Amino acid sequence: MPVEYYLWLAAILFGIGLLGVLTKRNALILMMSVELMLNAANLTFLAFARRSGDLAGHAIAFFVIAVAAAEAAVGLAVVIAIYRSRGAINVDEVRVLSE
């Protein structure tokens, strides 16, 4: 399969993630959209690694997956803490720094 197909798929995934970040106000949806954008970036790294035959793209993708897992765990913990204290996870309704 040509590498361009992977790049088009990555662009579509990144666009869907960006659309979710720009239009949704639910914190969980925002986190999922950011994860989708990170996976699109990983797919791009892997596509270029496949084209060049280099393993650096695979190493970068593995590192990004590890960082994304840590980011998701911390983000989910923050969302749960905010929900327990405020009763909402909508980013427009929650103003953590003002109180």
Swiss-Prot record:
GO terms for cellular component: NADH dehydrogenase complex; plasma membrane. Keywords: Cell inner membrane, Cell membrane, Membrane, NAD, Quinone, Translocase, Transmembrane, Transmembrane helix, Transport, Ubiquinone. InterPro entries: NADH_UbQ_OxRdtase_chain4L/K, NUOK/Mnh_C1-like. One of its GO terms (biological process) is ATP synthesis coupled electron transport. It is an enzyme of class 7 (translocase). The keyword Cell inner membrane applies. Its main location: membrane. It is a multi-pass membrane protein. It is found in: Cell inner membrane. The keyword Transport applies. NDH-1 is composed of 14 different subunits. Subunits NuoA, H, J, K, L, M, N constitute the membrane sector of the complex. GO terms for molecular function: NADH:ubiquinone reductase (non-electrogenic) activity; quinone binding. It comes from the Bacteria. Belongs to the complex I subunit 4L family. The gene is nuoK. PANTHER family: NADH-UBIQUINONE OXIDOREDUCTASE CHAIN 4L, NADH-UBIQUINONE OXIDOREDUCTASE SUBUNIT ND4L. NDH-1 shuttles electrons from NADH, via FMN and iron-sulfur (Fe-S) centers, to quinones in the respiratory chain. The immediate electron acceptor for the enzyme in this species is believed to be ubiquinone. Couples the redox reaction to proton translocation (for every two electrons transferred, four hydrogen ions are translocated across the cytoplasmic membrane), and thus conserves the redox energy in a proton gradient. This is NADH-quinone oxidoreductase subunit K. The chain crosses the membrane at residues 2-22, 28-48, 60-80. Pfam families: Oxidored_q2 (PF00420). Its EC number is 7.1.1.-. It catalyses: a quinone + NADH + 5 H(+)(in) = a quinol + NAD(+) + 4 H(+)(out).
